[in-house]
């Protein structure tokens, strides 16, 4: 299944790539950018911009700050996750606190999930 992309979000995605949050930068530079499977920053999936996307594993990695824990944020994230998962993409969510306090555990979960998805599914088309 080809994943649609809302091209009106291109400029916003480019800006977000340049202006990563401290937690996104930490995960990117200490782990994701050198991971042996290509992972993209601030990728457009449907009408959403996700923090990180591994196309070959069809995996989204999201880092959640405090706004995600309000009732409105929880509802939005639930809708967003359901729409992304409808494309056959799994969504992993980590809090900023987890990135700060347990980066090794976050990285291990990401690596295990990518490995499991790559060994259990046919190659994805981007």
PLM features per residue range, with description:
Residues 1-126:
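Nucleic-acid endo/exonuclease domains
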């Amino acid at each position: 299944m080809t994943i649609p992309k809302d091209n009106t979000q291109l400029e916003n995605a480019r800006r977000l790539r340049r202006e990563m949050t401290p937690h996104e930068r930490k995960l990117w530079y200490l782990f994701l950018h050198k991971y042996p499977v290509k992972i993209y920053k601030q990728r457009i999936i449907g009408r959403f911009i996700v923090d990180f996307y591994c196309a070959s594993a069809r995996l989204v990695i999201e880092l959640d700050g405090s706004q995600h824990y309000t009732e409105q944020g929880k509802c939005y994230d639930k809708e967003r996750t359901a729409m992304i998962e409808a494309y056959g993409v799994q969504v992993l969510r980590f809090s900023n606190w987890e990135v700060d306090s347990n980066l090794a555990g976050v990285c291990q979960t990401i690596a295990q999930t990518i490995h499991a998805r790559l060994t259990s599914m046919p190659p994805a088309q981007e």
